[in-house]
């Protein structure tokens, strides 16, 4: 299990308000699909700053937010919620996924390549699911943003089937360091 205190102690996080003993599960980076009880992670994109959507996440039921920019945070309004400040949310989520993976002793199949990664991942997961409970990459969330969220979705599966893609030099090495395929 992961706790707010793990982010504080292991990844230089700062608790702005809330419960450091809260269990962290059900991470989400998109307020359009956030569910009650999720942990919202505000990630900066090319044309948006996910930190700006923290209030929307709370209004839709998020129990905590992990942010790297708190200039707009209203702790008077959301002081009863858990808000964690980190240096960089994208780096934090990668480190958190790597830490969670280090706690797991299960087989992990990693699939990469130029063409056919998603189809191959789906076929391998389908075959394994006839005998095992499988966690697999959803769709093609196979980069330095999507892959950590896959690892963080782990509950009690027997095996993981992870798709790894790249769009910049060194990304496969970075993802392999998180996934540690067996």
Q: Which positions does each model-derived feature cover?
A:
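N-terminal leader/targeting and accessory segments in enzymes
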Residues: 1-95
